[in-house]
């Protein structure tokens, strides 16, 4: 689950992570009042108006503006609220701006990158710091890897003092900045582990001319599998920032990711799902989604999966590709038949079932009286997908 910048900063602040003063606003009038409050409290000649959407690259898209008065903030907020920001992370459809963060201006001296995430290859948390603040960390790692330091942190022992100091020294911090930097890194790691985050990213981490170390931006992603331990975080979810179909899928515990293709796919198992997407591509189509119904696919699960796939109007055909290991093929076939009867399939459906009770499943499909297209093997499935697209 993703949350907004202002929500992430609010959580981090509880753990002692230094963040600028900021106030969220849902209207131009609220933005003006927030700015007036900040100007009264601070000595900075500017405040920052920041669009709150679940995507990076807001500055380049016009989603971050400086203002020198509450009146100017009001004008900016009027123009920004309700507009659609298109960044490299939103896709061409963009995201509508529904809320703003009004934040105190900073007297910035240096900008850095700081992030913590899980390294699955080593089963450790990894602390990453870079002198290239404000840049995409993937780009830094590829083009200037010498400017990026990765420190493996064993979750059994946690972040050690020498590791936090190593990171601060790599960034060139000295004196008061160094002490504040080490304190900041310690606090961020504590927050990351306590809230079961999958990512805690500060980009940029800034050092002011006064020696303060603060999170100018914050991105927090939660591990969905640990959300039961943090019921209070559920209220932070902003479903308007999520794809409606992905949100519906999450309510049915389906692993669904919407793509921009024309062939829907329903598969059991992530590996087979990715292989199926390659198969669709080779057949001349483009996958419209990733959908893993899991090992315990039931008729109800299959029906919900079909509803979600058909919610994408770009879908011209559907490929069901199931290997019956834990789940029986006849059970999946029953779900496909039931779904076809209940929701009225309007596009060709190619069904390839292999494994436990595959013959029984094939017989059920043949005797269903429905226009379901059975496939024998992957090659046959690919050819039938190709044929379905040609006639669509």
From Swiss-Prot:
One of its GO terms (molecular function) is magnesium ion binding. Gene3D superfamilies: ATP-grasp fold, A domain, ATP-grasp fold, B domain, Succinyl-CoA synthetase domains. GO terms for biological process: succinyl-CoA metabolic process; tricarboxylic acid cycle. Pathway: Carbohydrate metabolism; tricarboxylic acid cycle; succinate from succinyl-CoA (ligase route): step 1/1. Mg(2+) binds at residues 203, 217. One of its GO terms (cellular component) is cytosol. Keywords: ATP-binding, Ligase, Magnesium, Metal-binding, Nucleotide-binding, Tricarboxylic acid cycle. Binds 1 Mg(2+) ion per subunit. It is an enzyme of class 6 (ligase). Belongs to the succinate/malate CoA ligase beta subunit family. Succinyl-CoA synthetase functions in the citric acid cycle (TCA), coupling the hydrolysis of succinyl-CoA to the synthesis of either ATP or GTP and thus represents the only step of substrate-level phosphorylation in the TCA. The beta subunit provides nucleotide specificity of the enzyme and binds the substrate succinate, while the binding sites for coenzyme A and phosphate are found in the alpha subunit. This is Succinate--CoA ligase [ADP-forming] subunit beta.
